[in-house]
Amino acid sequence: MSQIKNPFSEILSAYSAAIFEKDVDRYLSLYSDDILIFDMWNDWYLQGLQPWREMAENWFASLNSEKVVVTASEIQSHQFEDFVVGYAILRFAAIDAEGHELRYLNNRVSINMRQADGNWKIFHQHSSAPIDGKSIQVMFHMDDV
């Protein structure tokens, strides 16, 4: 029985593994050189692999002995010949060396990928979380909604 490969699901799996291992090179291998990131943290946007590398190096180093487990839900994607757009809710859970969950947050992600030389690469990634209209606070947990 053959299985149909879903490039978006494969990228999410590789993304989760690279983050769990805190492997900067593996993480960056998912992205095209001309990546444009609209991230939730610190900057309005990041353009290119070098700023994204610096972000990843700083993030992974800040974790010390903690690891981050990324799980995806509500996954949807649309594939065209050499283009994929996908959407998901990501849960980032920090765990200690014994595997105990310390904290977590959710965020929404939209990813655009294109195929080059037989490989799918992310060329645009946008992450967000809703803002409560009354408190003007970011809602980092889906159960806050």
Report each predicted region and the residues it spans:
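A beta-strand edge to alpha-helix "cap/lid" segment located at domain peripheries
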Residues: 2-26, 36-145
